[in-house]
UniProtKB/Swiss-Prot annotation:
One of its GO terms (biological process) is cobalt ion transport. GO terms for molecular function: cargo receptor ligand activity; cobalamin binding; molecular carrier activity. It comes from the Eukaryota. Disulfide bonds join 26-246, 103-288, 143-182. This is Cobalamin binding intrinsic factor. Glycans are attached at residues 311, 330, 413. Keywords: Cobalt, Cobalt transport, Disulfide bond, Glycoprotein, Ion transport, Phosphoprotein, Secreted, Signal, Transport. The modification Phosphoserine is found at residue 191. Interacts with CUBN (via CUB domains). Belongs to the eukaryotic cobalamin transport proteins family. It holds the Pfam family Cobalamin_bind. InterPro entries: Cbl-bd_prot, Cobalamin_Transport.
Length: 417
């Protein structure tokens, strides 16, 4: 009688609680608000008609209250015109939420996303944690548009997550928390099949794992996963055993902003909602008013202190030891660049000095990624890519944003995920 249960539930969805009230939240102190305004302006000003339309940026703009109305309109029109067939489930989900937050009807994009997810299952029993990121976004977007139709998919997703033994990923855990919290909130209390219990159990397991990644300074995972994690921990109905100190996290994030760590528009898009006291669960509640937003004056925007203009030396290694790849190599070069230069400048100088260091880049929503070095290119089918490390630690910023320090050893390692 599963169909009858779904029918009865569908009658009750409309009266189910839809509140997105934060369970644990904190706010930016008034004297620190100019830093957030400057961050938002940087993100909004990155939008041009030649860029890959990034739905995450439009969601952040709408949740925060856009200053640059022209950029907001441009992104909206670009996303409305995007071809759903060319998008992954995660990209399509973000597009649906972006258009919803713009008070635009996503149209057939919702039904296309639902079809993509109806037959969803992990690619393999031991699938990487990141394989759940896109489906998590899809369930979140579908929950906000048609929660009753999403229920069977969300149930399968929750059960799979609880059985999944693969290493935990904070970004994926945060998205899964938002998705299942949406479903949990939509189901009427006392409904059959114990769906709330299932989602509650899954949420408890996920937030416990997220809490284990909270560092002493409040950062959750790393500074770039903290934004989504803050959203998740602020709305989940199942709080972790280890209490989260939101104020400490906010304090550290604001300090990182002052150090210029958030320069990538995508990284800003993920942290901005939390800085504004919003989460992705607020997307359906965005009010679209007249185009009268006025940005703070430019004098309100603090900027990080400029760095020295002296030169630094960076040690740069390219390495490929993967079996099955024709060309194996491990080559190191020292290059000199101006202090404060981004890693991309190091790659360009190395390429100028030695043709073995020739590289190619691809534009993504996160900015430039290095797709090929020394004629060895990433391959989705083989799950290979170029990973950049400082010493033995993977970089958490892209080549167009990471700033090396003097005598730092950067390695580009061809590896698999």
């Amino acid at each position: 009688m599963a169909w009858l249960t779904l029918y009865l539930l569908s009658v009750l969805w409309a009266v189910a609680g839809t509140s997105t009230r934060a369970q644990s939240s904190c706010s930016v102190p008034p004297d620190q608000q100019p830093w957030v305004d400057g961050l938002q302006a940087l993100m909004e000003n990155s939008v041009t008609d030649s860029d890959f339309p990034n739905p995450s940026i439009l969601i952040a703009m709408n949740l925060a209250g856009a200053y640059n109305v022209e950029a907001q309109k441009l992104l909206t029109y670009q996303l409305m015109a995007s071809d759903s067939a060319d998008l992954t489930s995660g990209q399509l989900a973000l597009t649906v939420m972006a258009l919803t937050s713009s008070c635009r009807d996503p149209g057939s994009k919702v039904s296309t996303l639902l079809k993509k997810m109806e037959n969803w299952s992990p690619s393999s029993p031991g699938a990487e944690s990141s394989a759940f990121y896109g489906p998590g976004l899809a369930i979140l977007a579908l929950c906000q548009k048609s929660s009753e139709a999403t229920l069977p998919i969300a149930v399968r997703f929750a059960k799979t997550l609880m059985m999944e033994p693969s290493p935990f990923n904070v970004d994926t855990g945060a998205v899964a928390t938002l998705a299942l919290t949406c479903m949990y909130n939509k189901i009427p209390v006392g409904s059959q099949e114990n769906y709330r219990d299932l989602f509650g159990q899954a949420l408890k397991a996920i937030v416990e794992k997220i809490s284990l990644r909270i560092k002493a300074d409040g950062i959750i995972g790393d500074i770039y996963s903290t934004g989504l994690a803050m959203q998740a921990l602020s709305v989940t109905p199942e709080q972790p055993t280890k209490k989260w100190d939101c104020e400490k996290t906010m304090h550290t994030i604001l300090n990182e902003i002052k150090q210029g760590k958030f320069q990538n528009p995508m990284s800003i898009a993920q942290i901005l909602p939390s800085l504004k006291g919003k989460t992705y669960l607020d997307v359906p509640q965005v009010t679209c008013g007249p185009d009268h937003e006025v940005p703070p004056t430019l004098t309100d925007y603090p900027t990080p202190v400029p760095t020295s203009v002296s030169n630094i030396t960076v040690i740069y290694t390219i390495n490929n030891q993967l079996r099955g790849v024709d060309l194996l190599f491990n080559v190191t070069i020292e290059v000199s660049v101006k202090s404060g230069s981004v890693l991309l400048a190091v790659l360009e100088e190395a390429q100028r000095k030695n043709s073995m260091f020739k590289f190619e880049t691809t534009m993504t929503s996160w900015g430039l990624i290095v797709s090929s070095i020394n004629n060895i290119a990433e391959n989705v089918n083989h799950k290979t890519y170029w990973e950049f490390l400082s010493g033995k630690t993977p970089l958490d910023e892209g080549v167009a944003y990471y700033i090396p320090f003097n005598h730092e050893h950067i390695t580009a390692n061809f590896t698999q995920y």
